[in-house]
Amino acid sequence: MNNDGTLQLDGNGNPIPTYTQAQVTAFANAYTGWTYPTEPGGTLVKHNPQYFLGPMELFENNHDLGSKTLLLGTVLPAGQTGTVDLQDALDNIFNHPNLPPFVSGLLIQHLVTSNPSPAYVSRVANVFESGTFQGIGSGQRGDMQAVIAAILLDPEARRGDNPATAVATDGHLREPILYVANVLRAFGATTDGAQPVNYATNMGQAPMRSGSVFNFFPPNYIIPGTTMLGPEFDLQTTATALVRINFVNSFAFSSLGAGTTVSFGTYANMASSNPGAMVDALNALLLHGTMSATDRADILAAVNAVPAGTNQATLQAETAIYLIASSSQYQVMH
């Protein structure tokens, strides 16, 4: 992998493999011997029973003592303990030149945009290697404070601050768990998590239950009918898209069950005296002030169409919240 995240190719234009099956086996051997933590009052055995309260423990007699050839030809000598082999194997991966662009690219996709430019990835990868960014960081390789600062303060990330400078590939779809959490958090909701978790699960993302060790969606997923990457769109179907809409509908107009409480009183009070100001406040809260004039006019028209009555102001606030939080402009995070 090049420092900008693009693949290195051989003379025939094929990607150059980073590792072989033999190296995968060597890493597996380096990790042998580790088992579940011992339960209180128990005794460490070769295969401890499932117990999750604590770090894994090493049963040394179950560790492979042979030599292991890892990435870049690094050899772990025979006879090392399981703890030393584990640390050396992790160091071998951490110091591989592919790691900075690989990790940087994935972090950018999760935090800023599904389609970072190679130059963006390269800038962040360089910070990963140096461990410092504009005075932030320890100077050690992989310093996450420096890396995250470089990601969020990069010009390619900050151009989204001004809708006029944004481009079509900016941003990324909020994955279900973050979509649900962000809506709840925006309005100060409290919850036992039951119904919100059900909604996220029905959107295709059951918390802590990824279908594989490679996360809920692949980083190289291309949105059908386009050439754009959109990892989170791998979970998006007609059915899950409707679940998103139904979630916001229940949140705004009814409830998410007895375990979740929220109040829209602040916005209802604003709607009772100035519906336009209420829409503007929600624009600032949910869209950071990026709502277009056309969208504002349409939402305000829907708000003003709510018939007069005892609950008019509340329904006006709920209508605006529903329309904004279910919109593509909100669901795609910029």
Model feature map: region roles:
Residues H96, P100, S104-M144, A149-H334:
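Flexible, low-complexity segments enriched for small/polar residues
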